[in-house]
């Protein structure tokens, strides 16, 4: 059931579906203050407005792009070699790291020297790096020194999505350019619940947010392949995709394929939650081929090292696992250090107990040893490891509610308070932190979760799994959770962990991954609109204009899933002629509201009157016709 070594080492190939450019799109790069800061975006070409709607040029729009070089036809993709390393010069020029002779963790050395793994192993020629003795290489440390790193400038450019260039192109598009730019740039002010979203994201603003702990850039020095991204409530809401094998299903090749598929559709981060065979090798293949940050839950692998017996876990085994993964390039660790012994009995009153795998592992350990976990007791030792590689904390909510019955109970909120205390300890070491959140929460309790997190965790970025707003829809939990995700994203959550239709039922496949990603892109974007994030509405405006003007191809291409939109349209109107028709199959040619609206506008223009006057005149004509016909509501045929 697991990986085929010969396939991976000798014939591993990229998923062809992941490297095709999206329709009418091309990869562009915006250069920063230096030539090696090249920020990727996706440019979507639009057709011109037809003469019947008053001819206009519609310049391309720019959207945030997470697909890395996979959708760039100019890039040579070979997953056996991995991606290029654009961050490596930035890391080296800081002169605060050293190259190690090889892996230093016991487990990493053991895997490297195991001849049985030779054909399975990713053939990495680069050696791992670590901070020089006494140095801190975290983005938070640089930010607090007043240093704007290339990573910070990169994410500032990325967050603005080339908005100014788009508006300038609109202004130059024709005689109505100024008016068109005003129209397409218009957006609702939004309600941000105290967030401080600026009109323009600058590198200095990024630096200040990271220094305060309100944002993080997950960027391990051993993951130079990534295109930096930022997580924080004053930035675009991000989404995380979970992948990973299990003891019963999936291979390394499938997991790499899921990663490239997830980032194609908009996954900002990916968590590898593998619990089956070859966890170390699976992770290496994923990291070397990932342009987005990769997270893990190290306790999963540590548990495998003790044959699944939680009570046999030790600090030494866990520490070795952290170093092993940090040297591979993992960008953020989920660590359930907030599961305290005194909180465990509180879960006895729950409907669904402890549903977090990491939380249940640590709860079992605490009960077996009747003392606080080694994660909690050695938290400052963990910080020392994190800052030597710039691994960010994702402080795990091991006591999150697994049903709406258990939402906002004393165990969940007790752990949240402890996570806030641990956050301040991490910040003392200049280590980046985000906080994980629930879970299963009914809609009316969601804002309380956000408010408590902001207060008790000192505005560290919140990262939530949904939350699911009802428990009655197995098979549709991407929807039950998407509702909660949109809400909590609006209230201030910085990153949303996707839920697929397979949640609670099985391991997701590629189709499920895409469904989860698209659902959560909708939730994140809806939250950006509600917060009033500058420029968030540009894409909506462009699609709405295309819809009104019956530019069908543009509607498909501007949307989050062009393939699905085109497929649905073509189910009933498959001919190419339908792609330029002024109606769809919902209303047909005679009842299309947008077509009728345009006819009213055309009539008004010909008569030299306003649309209101045209509608009034039309109503008067129809009233006269009604009286002349005998004032009968139902006419005899």
Curated annotation (Swiss-Prot):
Coiled coil: none annotated. Binds 1 [4Fe-4S] cluster per subunit. The cluster is coordinated with 3 cysteines and an exchangeable S-adenosyl-L-methionine. Its cofactor is [4Fe-4S] cluster. Its EC number is 4.1.99.17. Pathway: Cofactor biosynthesis; thiamine diphosphate biosynthesis. One of its GO terms (molecular function) is zinc ion binding. It catalyses: 5-amino-1-(5-phospho-beta-D-ribosyl)imidazole + S-adenosyl-L-methionine = 4-amino-2-methyl-5-(phosphooxymethyl)pyrimidine + CO + 5'-deoxyadenosine + formate + L-methionine + 3 H(+). Transmembrane segments: none annotated. [4Fe-4S] cluster binds at residues 584, 587, 592. Substrate binds at residues 242, 271, 300, 336, 356-358, 397-400, 436, 463. Gene3D superfamilies: 6.10.250.620, Radical SAM ThiC family, central domain. Pfam families: ThiC-associated, ThiC_Rad_SAM. GO terms for biological process: thiamine biosynthetic process; thiamine diphosphate biosynthetic process. Zn(2+) binds at residues 440, 504. GO terms for cellular component: cytosol. Keywords: 4Fe-4S, Iron, Iron-sulfur, Lyase, Metal-binding, S-adenosyl-L-methionine, Thiamine biosynthesis, Zinc. It is an enzyme of class 4 (lyase). Belongs to the ThiC family. Catalyzes the synthesis of the hydroxymethylpyrimidine phosphate (HMP-P) moiety of thiamine from aminoimidazole ribotide (AIR) in a radical S-adenosyl-L-methionine (SAM)-dependent reaction. NCBIfam families: PRK09284.1, PRK13352.1, thiC. Homodimer. This is Phosphomethylpyrimidine synthase. It comes from Janthinobacterium sp. (strain Marseille) (Minibacterium massiliensis). The lineage of its organism: Bacteria, Pseudomonadati, Pseudomonadota, Betaproteobacteria, Burkholderiales. The gene is thiC.
